[in-house]
Amino acid sequence: MSELQSRTSPFSGGLFIKTYGCQMNEYDSDRMAKLLEKTYGLNLVETPEEADMLLLNTCSVREKAQEKVFDELGRWKKWKAAKPNRVIGVGGCVASQEGDVIRKRAPLVDVIFGPQTLHRLPAMIEEALALRTATEQDKKLKKRAIIDISFPEIEKFDNLAEPESNGVSAFVSVMEGCSKYCTFCVVPYTRGEEFSRPFSDVMAEIESLAKQGVREVNLLGQNVNAYRGEMPDGEMADLAVLIHAVRAVEGIDRIRFTTSHPNEMTQSLIDCYAEVPELVSHLHLPIQSGSDRVLAMMKRNHMAIEYKATIRKIKKIRPDLSLSGDFIIGFPGETCDDFKETLALVKEMNYDRSFSFIYSPRPGTPAASLPDDVELHMKKRRLQALQAMLNEQTAAISEGMVGTTQRVLVERLSRNSTNEVSGRTENNRVVNFEGPPELIGQFVDVLIEEAYANSLKGKLVATPEAEQFNQRQFYAL
């Protein structure tokens, strides 16, 4: 037991965390919650009013990220005023990029930490608490938040709490950071260069989760297919090697990975779609634009034809591959012809649920110095046209699933009905269907009967579990 753990906790309330952004931030927030529960006995609560500690885990990828942080902190002022002993912290990518600004503009904030220093939270909190009892001559110190936005890389993973399952599906961070330096992207400046966790550490986490009942793992990274983890023998394992190892873990029957870069889709990784049945027939592979000219300005270092060739290779192995992507609309210099090339690529590739955004300059990136010469009304029109096409494709794929039998991992009770359970298909569709709670954690076959905007409705197909359920329903009549 650490010195902090051995002392009486200074907190009697709970912990409130608000998370913006990507799945990596969700993973980080989960690890923060477990770390602070272990250190201080803090349990997560639903509202700031219930909390002794309020944490904001931020994202700086999209427009007005900094303003969102200060807007939220403005709303938190009343909670600090009502209970001055509350600890307020800001973490994540905005903290990494704007730490000093936050310290100057938001005196209610006690601690500021980056994505790679969240493991130091307990020590930072202790320092912040100590400042509150500082002598009169140290009053100036009281006005300063404790800040640590450095990049210690792997140290973060070495010092976090043991992984604990929150369900039958789990995120596992295998690498962080980015070394691609696309001209529009702030990630290399907020999360640092790419670094990979050692192979044995990743496997130990997955094996621990499997013993706790996890059936599906989602391998995470800003460029997850750039994973290069050192093995015990000194050799380096790439993502393909890791996937083969994960499939051998008892209890793990479904594997996902996200997010990927087209340049890291190696042949060995593509071969996994033929060799690893546990790997889902779904791939999230951002391209950002269908125009080679725009891709060059973005410094993506690949052409549209290379991207399409990669998808075709995988679809030869998995014809049912579900593809999603990311698109940026209105990048500086984008012409109507460039945008038409994006629409043509989307039409050809047939995307299943994708993300599209209007370009906004991110501070400190090379593209921020370019003239933002695409008028806003034009950006909005292009975005509307792209999203209409993407939504049409997604709806058609959902409708095409009606009448098919899908393998579903049952995750929880349905929010729609107490008689239903909810799970996900390989292409990440939520399916609700009648079934007992005992099915949670099981893979079952479900006949899809109806398609809605955000979910599917189905019927349990004959399995031993389904037969038992149907018998109970019959005798209940």
UniProtKB/Swiss-Prot annotation:
Binds 2 [4Fe-4S] clusters. One cluster is coordinated with 3 cysteines and an exchangeable S-adenosyl-L-methionine. It comes from the Bacteria. CDD domains: Radical_SAM. SUPFAM superfamilies: Radical SAM enzymes. [4Fe-4S] cluster 1 binds at residues 22, 59, 93. Gene3D superfamilies: Methylthiotransferase, N-terminal domain, tm_1862 like domain. Residues 399-462 form the TRAM domain. GO terms for cellular component: cytosol. One of its GO terms (molecular function) is metal ion binding. Belongs to the methylthiotransferase family. MiaB subfamily. This is tRNA-2-methylthio-N(6)-dimethylallyladenosine synthase. It comes from Hydrogenovibrio crunogenus (strain DSM 25203 / XCL-2) (Thiomicrospira crunogena).
